[in-house]
Amino acid sequence: MTARLRPELAGLPVYVPGKNVPGSIKLASNETVYGPLPSVHAAIERAVAIVNRYPDNACVDLKAALAMHLGSDVAPEQIAVGSGSVTLCQQLVQITSAAGDEVMMGWRSFECYLPIVQVAGAIAVKVPLREHTYDLDAMLAAITDRTRLIFVCNPNNPTSTVVDPDALVRFVDAVPADILIAIDEAYVEYIRDGLLPNSLELALSRSNVVVLRTFSKAYGLAGLRVGYAIGHPELITALDKVVMPFAVTNVAQAAAIASLEASGELMARTDALVAERTRVSTTLRDAGFELPPSQANFLWLPLGSRTEDFVQEAANARLVVRPFASEGVRVTIGAPAENDALLQFACDWIARTER
């Protein structure tokens, strides 16, 4: 007889990350191609010397550095730190939603939302996207007396789009004050074209808004797992009640602090990536691909039924991309040479398949 497990696990898939095939170009996981800056590397080396000690569970120094980085309006008690922003997503579900409660998100969106909600015994309410973008009006109409938490993934993963900043403010104002809104900004550093929302002001001026960010993308610390949340102090205290103790290591905290100190250099890297994003997007559109305007470090190719063929042929060309069955392909913007290889394959593929 096997151990009795929770029924919520039935049908729950195991998370499958982007593949890493030796010898191939990996454009599947939205990682930065850049390694740590020398100053960050040095901070990591120093922190390695104390890995025999437990880390600071309160992340005091990191919270202070984040408060300074985010601006004078942000205080350390308005910041929670987690082992990547995905753990903070999980904590938000834990502090808001019990069995039978509803957690809303646009769909398709970040894959981890669904299992986090399902494990909690809550109900995931998936509101279809409109033109590959969160449909805030439809989400507002879908709110019920059981809605406890709303995720707004902005930019949205995997479709790369952002909502209109003014529409986001109107949405926040219209949502009942007892429903928590989580603005998930893992890719916020890549937003351009005047589309950056004033999300921090929303979080600091309202008790039911929290902003999630991460060091995994633009800051290049995906392997160290550091994310953070900004919100009302009572909300932050609630998050701290359900955090896994010592989840953010000494090394991760030191690297994050050093990255904030070098944020100017790191943000220059995002400018270079945005330039590549523009180049790759333009070339793909000129070749005949339809894709929404990206404000992230990846592109969304809504290929529908042709998704599997594109992915398989890309693999044959030693390119690893991220498929979403029958919907499309997410392609990370890589180094220029990697992007050139992608463009050569993709332009050839569409020329052959659309004859």
Swiss-Prot record:
What keywords tag this UniProt record? Aminotransferase, Pyridoxal phosphate, Transferase
- Show the catalytic activity: an aromatic L-alpha-amino acid + 2-oxoglutarate = an aromatic oxo-acid + L-glutamate
Q: Which domain of life is it from?
A: Bacteria
Q: Which residues cross the membrane?
A: none
- State if Transferase is listed as a keyword: yes
Alphabetical list of InterPro entries matching this protein: Aminotrans_II_pyridoxalP_BS, Aminotransferase_I/II_large, ArAT, HisP_aminotrans, HistidinolP_aminotransfase, PyrdxlP-dep_Trfase, PyrdxlP-dep_Trfase_major, PyrdxlP-dep_Trfase_small
Sites where N6-(pyridoxal phosphate)lysine occurs are at: K217
Q: Which cofactors, by name?
A: pyridoxal 5'-phosphate
Q: Which GO molecular function annotations are given, in alphabetical order?
A: aromatic-amino-acid transaminase activity; histidinol-phosphate transaminase activity; pyridoxal phosphate binding
Question: Which Pfam families does its entry note?
Answer: Aminotran_1_2
Example GO biological process term?
Answer: L-histidine biosynthetic process
- EC number of the protein: 2.6.1.57
Q: Which of the seven top EC classes does this enzyme belong to?
A: transferase
- Write down the NCBIfam families for this protein, in alphabetical order: hisC, PRK03321.1
Cross-referenced PANTHER family:
HISTIDINOL-PHOSPHATE AMINOTRANSFERASE (PTHR43643:SF3), HISTIDINOL-PHOSPHATE AMINOTRANSFERASE 2 (PTHR43643)
What family is this protein classified in? Answer: Belongs to the class-II pyridoxal-phosphate-dependent aminotransferase family.
Q: How does it assemble?
A: Homodimer.
Give the protein's biological function: Aminotransferase that catalyzes the conversion of aromatic amino acids and 2-oxoglutarate into corresponding aromatic oxo acids and L-glutamate.
What is the name attached to this protein's record? Answer: Aromatic amino acid aminotransferase
Q: Which organism is it from?
A: Mycobacterium avium (strain 104)
